[in-house]
Amino acid sequence: MKYLTPGPIQLPKDVLNHIKNQPYFHRSSEFKEIFSSVIEKMEKIVGEEVLILPGTGTFSIDTMVYNYVNPNEDVILIDIGEFSRRLGESLISRNVKLHIIKSEIGDVVTPDIIEDYSKKINDLKAIAMVHNETSLGVANRYIEKIQDLAKSLNAILLVDSVSGIPAERISKNIDVIATASHKAFMSIPGASIIFYSIKPRNFDKLPPSMNLNKFIDMKKRLETPYTPPINVIMGLDYSTNYILKVGIDKYAEIHKERTDYLRNLVKLKPVAKEKFGSNTVSAFYTNNTKAIIESLKNKGYTIASGMGNLSNSIIRIGVMGDVSLDDVKKVAEVINNYD
């Protein structure tokens, strides 16, 4: 079975070979050597400092929220889909004053709309957004302008890019980005990853497992406060080598090439507006979600259905990982048997 899913992805065999090895003791010099290498390469790929925690993409989001906003602070949420709403759930659990700007399905919210809305708020502390909305295959490519806007408003920008970076590139430093190991970084699930250009600003005590200041302090000694996801990091050691060998820009271009090929072949209507179509995950409208998924399974391919209210009316296809243009063609051929 080959996985063209939004994640976990189809892993290259070389990544799997690295992951299956005996885990190092996390206080050993052998682990520190790999940990140092992975940190250096990830920071080179994204251009910001990185922290690696045990967890998932969701835990990465929660950790970002709890370290960078405080109860009763005003926060704008840009809602472009299901994972935007999950980001909102995390913010609500933090007891912030949440202001939501919602887009139409397949579209994004532009910086001018956010700027106009912000004038209603006296003391805005943060803007929170999803960079690459996995549920709909939508990429918000205004992210750099939104970062500039946040700075001009004396607020910070919190970004969920779990299915985005480094395949869906960001061209400038963002205040905080939450992501994970099992999508475009091409490892297995198990690592919450946070890139940051500003230090945590929480005013209260946090659970030890999500206190980023602990991780920042121990990173200086190439250690983590608690047992890290060792084999995930071993996989990242190989995958980051691969990304840098291919080239950071070329790696993103490869995903765009696969996605463009897919969209040109598939006859169904894409969910995303053309200029906001994600380069890692594509979504298409269909009345035959279950039949398409079952037919592809019989051909040796797994794709995903929609989420929430769209679970039976769209399909989602990921092109991250070990996916060839031939795989894309075969998947499209099956899909095109259905209206």
Task: Cite the ranges covered by each PLM segment.
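PLP-dependent aminotransferase-like
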Residues: 69-123
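N-terminal "arm"/small-domain region of PLP-dependent enzymes with the aminotransferase-like
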Residues: 1-28
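Conserved PLP-binding catalytic core of the aspartate aminotransferase-like
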Residues: 270-296
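PLP-dependent enzyme catalytic core of the Aspartate aminotransferase-like
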Residues: 313-339
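Conserved PLP-dependent catalytic core of the aminotransferase class-I/II
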Residues: 37-45, 240-272, 295
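Conserved N-terminal alpha-helix of the aminotransferase class I/II PLP-enzyme fold
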Residues: 18-63, 67, 82, 86, ...
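Active-site C-terminal subdomain of aminotransferase-like
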Residues: 10-11, 182-261
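Active-site phosphate-binding strand-loop segment of PLP-dependent enzymes
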Residues: 109-161, 165-166
